[in-house]
Every structure is written in structure tokens, then in C-alpha cells.
């Protein structure tokens, strides 16, 4: 707060929404003159930055220290001199050596070509396949040839430039969708009721299928809060994953031991989710944001996103549970009617 009073502030993903709104609003109103930021403001924002200073072209990633791409640099310096606020903008790179090379590479260089992820990532292809089959078979089942034709006209296929690889990838994921019970191909491809529900939930079909496995555990009587939270934090869509620091490992071990039966049944081994799992467990136990922030050494914004992400996935899980409950009731009713008619 003292920094903001003096016209300077910082901006990063760990800020809670209230602080973020204040900082962005006051920066737009030019009451904040100097703003340091992580890549949260590097692209897609329109702020009155007359000058952008990049202190280093190196950044820590999951693979260690790496150079930022030319595209990232262009996005960063593109924040300076927005037409709505200024008639010019300045971009400065702090060079720790080799200024000529940096000038040639970043300032004069061409941004890297864009790459489509539609065919690179199985989850993306599954989502798009299910979506196409649903929309293309509104009145009649769609054919394999139509599916191939559609995807062969995408930017991803253009970059792939190999029809045989395209067909191989699509065939593999069509088999997966059938395995998950989301499409049929008796007289062409069309979605099942489960497939339609998953399509509207906008989630990876594999994630939805994995959730049904937990429903089976629930029906068998294995049901408690820790298990649901554990399942949610292990999903690929749960992106706020942090390993547990050593000082919390004992608390995590106690939780696991108390819920050992379910933990072993789920067969999850991703320890990177454990800190998020502890935060969620304390959140539903009514621990305040401030206490959680101090206890887990986590920023309020990170805790907020962990909570919101978990809420979204919990909703998805609830909808899948509702679907299978209604589906089971419908099948039971059909069975009773059939027995009565016979």
C-alpha cells in the first residue's frame, strides 16, 4: 500500500482480484507511474505504458534458464505506446553483454512461426473430434471420410503436410472416443448421450471418462471429501499444482494415512498436487485466505485460482454424476417396462 501511495506498484499472478483491479485502474488513471510486472502484462492488455523495460531476455522455465522467444519480446515491447494513450512508445532491453547480437536477434528478428496444437496434443484432438461429430451428425451420422476431409483443411493439417499421419492420429482418437462410450459408428459416427453431455461441459473426453471411474468407487461406498479433492487436483485441467514443502510433508502423510484405502484405490502418484490439495482441504475447513497465505507461504491470488479451478472441476464432476444417475434410472425404468410387457 505504501508503494502505491508513492506512485509505484507490482503486478503478478499471485495478486488477489481486488489488488489487481486497484493497480490496473490506477495505472490507467496514471496515478501509478512505475509498474513492475511478470509476464501477466506481457500480452493482450491495453495500458498506458510509454516505456517498457525488459531487465533480461532470460527466464526460468520448467527446463531451467532459457531465452525468451522473439514473439514474446515483440508482445512485451508492443505494450508501449498504445494508440489510445500515447503517440509513441519506447522499448529497452537491459543487456548484460552482446548488445549487437540482442539487437539483431530481437529487434530486427522475425517472430517464430505459429504452431497449431490441434493435432499435436491428444486432448485437443479428442475435444475437436467430439465437437465435429456432434455438430456434423445433427440429422444423420457422419462418415469417416467427412471427418478426414474436415481436419485435412485445418491449419494443423497444413503444418503436418502428411495425410497418412493425419489419418493415423484421427483413427487412434476415434477408437478412444468409442472406448470411452462417447461415440458409436454403427452406420456412421454419432455421439452418445454421454458424449453430448461431455461436449457441452467443454472438457477433455479422457478426463470425463476418468471421472466415471471415481463414480464407481463412490457407488461401492468409498466416498469422502479427501478422495474427491484428491481426484480433482490430479486432473490435467487442474493447473495450479505445487509440491508440498518439507515442513508440510508430515501433515500430508497424516491425511494420506487416514484416507489410505481411497488413496491407494485411486492409484494417483502426482505429488505435485499435494500443496494444492492441502490448501483446498483447509479452505473447506473454513481457514481464511490470510491464514492460508501465511500457513502455506502462498500468494492470495494463487489460492484464489486454486479454489476457482477446483470449483469448475467439481461442477463438471457433479454434472457427470447426475448424467450417470439419470441414465441408470432410465435404464432401470426401461427394464421394468420390458419385463412388464413380456
Question: Residue locations for each model-derived region?
Answer:
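Conserved C-terminal RecA-like helicase domain
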Residues: 1-34, 62, 66-69, 146-149
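Conserved, well-folded catalytic cores of nucleic-acid-processing
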Residues: 3, 7, 26-34, 55, ...
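Amphipathic alpha-helical transducer elements in NTP-driven molecular machines
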Residues: 5, 17-21, 34-38, 66-77, ...
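Generic beta-strand/beta-sheet core signal
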Residues: 11, 35-38, 54-55, 86, ...
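Beta-edge loop/turn motif
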Residues: 20-56, 64, 78, 191-198
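Conserved segment of the helicase C-terminal RecA-like domain
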Residues: 47, 51-61, 65-107
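C-terminal or mid-to-C-terminal helical accessory/interaction module adjacent to the motor/catalytic core
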Residues: 87-174
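C-terminal helical accessory/scaffold domains
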Residues: 126, 131, 142, 157, ...
Amino acid at each position: 500500500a505504501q508503494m502505491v501511495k508513492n506512485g509505484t506498484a507490482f503486478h503478478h499472478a499471485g495478486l488477489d482480484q481486488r489488488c489487481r483491479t486497484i493497480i490496473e485502474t490506477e495505472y490507467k488513471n496514471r496515478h501509478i507511474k512505475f509498474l513492475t510486472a511478470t509476464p501477466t502484462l506481457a500480452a493482450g492488455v491495453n495500458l498506458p505504458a510509454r516505456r517498457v523495460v525488459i531487465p533480461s531476455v532470460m527466464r526460468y522455465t520448467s527446463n531451467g534458464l532459457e531465452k525468451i522467444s522473439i514473439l514474446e519480446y515483440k508482445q512485451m515491447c508492443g505494450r508501449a505506446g498504445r494508440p489510445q494513450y500515447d503517440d509513441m512508445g519506447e522499448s529497452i532491453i537491459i543487456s548484460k553483454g552482446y548488445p549487437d547480437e540482442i539487437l539483431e536477434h530481437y529487434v530486427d528478428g522475425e517472430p517464430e512461426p505459429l504452431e497449431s496444437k490441434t493435432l499435436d496434443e491428444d486432448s485437443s484432438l479428442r475435444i475437436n473430434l467430439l465437437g465435429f461429430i456432434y455438430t456434423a451428425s445433427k440429422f444423420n451420422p457422419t462418415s469417416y471420410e467427412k471427418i478426414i476431409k474436415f481436419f485435412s483443411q485445418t491449419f494443423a493439417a497444413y503444418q503436418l503436410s502428411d495425410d497418412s499421419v493425419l489419418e493415423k492420429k484421427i483413427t487412434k482418437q476415434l477408437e478412444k472416443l468409442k472406448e470411452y462410450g462417447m461415440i458409436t459408428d454403427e452406420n456412421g459416427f454419432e455421439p452418445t448421450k454421454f458424449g453430448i453431455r461431455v461436449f457441452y461441459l467443454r472438457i477433455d473426453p479422457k478426463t470425463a471418462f476418468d471421472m466415471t471411474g471415481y463414480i464407481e468407487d463412490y457407488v461401492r461406498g468409498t466416498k469422502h471429501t479427501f478422495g474427491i479433492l484428491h481426484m480433482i487436483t490430479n486432473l490435467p485441467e487442474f493447473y495450479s499444482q505445487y509440491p508440498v514443502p518439507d515442513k508440510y510433508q508430515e501433515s500430508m502423510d497424516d491425511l494420506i494415512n487416514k484416507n489410505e484405502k481411497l488413496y491407494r484405490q485411486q492409484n494417483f502418484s502426482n505429488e505435485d498436487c499435494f500443496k494444492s490439495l492441502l490448501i483446498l482441504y483447509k479452505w473447506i475447513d473454513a481457514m481464511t485466505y490470510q491464514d492460508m497465505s501465511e500457513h502455506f507461504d502462498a500468494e492470495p491470488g494463487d489460492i484464489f485460482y486454486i479454489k476457482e479451478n477446483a470449483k469448475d472441476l467439481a461442477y463438471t464432476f457433479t454434472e457427470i454424476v447426475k448424467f450417470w444417475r439419470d441414465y441408470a434410472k432410465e435404464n432401470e425404468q426401461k427394464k421394468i417396462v420390458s419385463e412388464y410387457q413380456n
